[in-house]
């Protein structure tokens, strides 16, 4: 995902690159919430019923700082399944670049810190 985002600093993305960025976002989102769920289960949290529950719990455990942005990410991830127009795709891509990618990086850094303890 970072590679495609870096291209946006040089020029507009072509259709293939936009599609690639959205697909990489979808994969990264799935890995991120499942990583949070695994961490929570390893720490005795039970009864989680999906990504929204997992994100709420991750916020309460301080795995993530911006719970609202993660909830918006869930909504946008669900929207990517039904993107049929360029305007909607452009909106989601803007969020991926400016909001969601930094959130993934923050989660990665937090998990790295926890792994070193």
What residue spans do the PLM features occupy?
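Solvent-exposed interaction patches of small proteins and small membrane subunits
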Residues: 1-117
